[in-house]
Swiss-Prot record:
Residues binding FMN: 9-11, 36, 87-90, 122
Keyword Flavoprotein: yes
Assigned EC number: 2.5.1.129
Keywords: Flavoprotein, FMN, Prenyltransferase, Transferase
Enzyme class: transferase
Catalytic reaction annotation: dimethylallyl phosphate + FMNH2 = prenylated FMNH2 + phosphate
Protein known as: Probable UbiX-like flavin prenyltransferase
Amino acid sequence: MKLIVGMTGATCAPLGVALLQALREMPNVETHLVMSKWAKTTIELETPYSARDVAALADFSHNPADQAAIISSGSFRTDGMIVIPCSMKTLAGIRAGYADGLVGRAADVVLKEGRKLVLVPREMPLSTIHLENMLALSRMGVAMVPPMPAFYNHPETVDDIVHHVVARVLDQFGLEHPHARRWQGLPQARNFSQENE
């Protein structure tokens, strides 16, 4: 499997780092990373890593200004792309087909080729413009996976919440996260079901 990972300047850089760390442990997945200029700034603000450290997690890292990179062409076959986190500027550009920079161009290629595009949009609160852009992209087949925490799995650390979001992103490609804690039903419902088998 070949996946493109785009990181933009929105907050939640730890999600992108954790995704790359998880994919690094999957020998059958080849990753192509592109970080926007502001993604690099956000990474260094929100994580203990440098942009160089994060780039090293991917099999290939591409210059965000390089519109001639291999991921900018549909003839380079991939299984899809994840933009994590996805800023509202990037999301709006993807919706409009405004391929400004390599993140936008790679997403545009994935869309035109009918491949899977997963966006992890990060903004709060959401304006009508944001919601309409997400709805339009959803109607095009783009998967919206906002980084919303779950509490049924009783997270004890920020990492637990991050792993849960990353696991839900990986689910979009049928990939299993080793730290995923999945819903098992309510305890009383499980007991009732077992008693009535």
